[in-house]
Amino acid sequence: MKSALAKLGYRSYHMEEAVMNFEKGDLDKWNAYMECRSEMDWQKLFADYDATADLPSAFYYREQMAAFPDAKVILTVRDPEAWWQSTAKLVNLHNTLVEPIKFIPRFGAFQRLFRNCERVVAGGSFDHDHVVARFNAHNAEVKATVPPERLLVFEVKDGWEPLCKFLGAPVPNEPFPHENTGIATVDKMMRLLVLTDLIKLAWPWLAGLAVVLILLLNR
């Protein structure tokens, strides 16, 4: 959905943005809010964005509807089993890639946020039937909560027409982005940020070593 909205001119706030905005404090803000330690300034958090997508913001659609009275809600629906498979892969990726490097500040905060999201999604149990039931219950809740004039129930196979009609946007002259690149995108982003943050952590030590070497060579 993020790719489709981008082609329509919308800049979406995604989990990726929360991680990228670590130095602005986004991960800490989300953790504090999800752990009931502080309120969230939605207007400030999303000041540079036109839309929100993905976790953790998707949990708080009611709060965002209150903060943005003119906002519309797009509920993307898919086969529950396909969603479960995708979610399980994402959890495995996180456990493989992020858990071992949580000593890096950005990834320690991300690991905490991921566990907070996991708690809200799974409700304390990652049992297949339990989690799928919660997924279905969430979709039913959104349909029952959001006024019909503000809600689009959307499947990727529906293509551009219903989405563009709902948003009042022209239909792009290109295929709808059907591919699910979430896992690949997360993997690529994580690896890049790991390298960047490790360099930042190591730089003072490398600089100090360079000074020592220079001093020794000048003796």
Residue ranges and their predicted role:
Residues 1-42, 47:
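PAPS-dependent sulfotransferase catalytic core
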Residues 1-5, 65, 86-88, 154-171:
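PAPS/PAP-binding and catalytic site of the sulfotransferase fold
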Residues 194-219:
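Terminal signal-anchor or tail-anchor transmembrane helices
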Residues 16, 53-57, 77-78, 156:
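Short His-Asn-centered micro-motif
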Residues 161-197:
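Juxtamembrane amphipathic/hinge helix adjacent to a transmembrane helix
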Residues 64-89, 163:
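Conserved phosphate-donor/acceptor-positioning beta-strand/loop module used by diverse small-molecule
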Residues 37, 41-44, 53-56, 130-138:
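Soluble or luminal CAZymes and related metallo-dependent hydrolases
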Residues 85-150, 154:
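PAPS-dependent sulfotransferase catalytic domain
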